[in-house]
């Protein structure tokens, strides 16, 4: 059976339950944590394998072109945590720490880097630097608006 057929079957099975609870998430993690309950075991296993294959030798996750990218790493980590793929966390932690501490991040990569850093490493001098950089970035963006 093809991936999308299995996915559709899993979604239908979930939707057809007699009692469907509405989800009002405040965070992405609680929603993703429900994925293993919604999808069948074969699909969860396939997604786990995909996540592991997408991690590069650098420790981050590959974009569509195969290059390691913070944006893709953010989503890779969210999915890995939801599906309990713990093997990817330590290499990702090292990748994020190295990249954030040794690069000048801007735009979406700044935000992804800050989220990943606080999630994987925690609070320290670097996370405070990222926080100040984001505040500065937001102030500049607001002041440039008409």
Predicted regions and their residues:
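Preference for long, amphipathic alpha-helical scaffolds in soluble/luminal domains
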Residues: 1-146
